[in-house]
């Protein structure tokens, strides 16, 4: 009975969950991400990527739809000339390419500056470890 139950648990493990790495072979450019607390429609994630001393640092909840997921947020902006505060929509698209390969892209141009330092990026192929 225990063997059957443990096999059942293994089959229900979400395909998104795990530890992922961007360019694992390079210490100047790379990244690490953990995806956890997954259910059928969402997962939590923490991500850090870097290029030299510039970093991207993002954490939140992705919404899953088949082999794609999105993280959506808002970037605070302040216009000094008009003394106006406002928010710009930003986000990241996660696309599962295989069981061990995920492609990340910014949803729009404003997303880069919301999450990353001058030369860092989180875009690219992430490999499950």
Q: What are the functions of these language-model segments?
A:
Residues 26-66, 103-120:
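N-terminal glycine/threonine-rich, aromatic-flanked beta-hairpin/loop signature
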Residues 12-30, 71-73, 122-129:
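Tryptophan-anchored aromatic micro-motifs
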Residues 18, 33-34, 60, 92, ...:
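Residue-level detector of beta-strand structural context in well-folded domains
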Residues 68, 96-103, 124-129:
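A short, hydrophobic secondary-structure junction motif
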Residues 71-91, 112-114:
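An anionic, turn-rich surface loop/hairpin at beta-sheet edges
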Residues 13-21, 39-46, 64-81:
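Short, hydrophobic/aromatic-rich segments at coil-to-beta transitions
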Residues 1-12:
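Bacterial Sec-dependent N-terminal signal peptides
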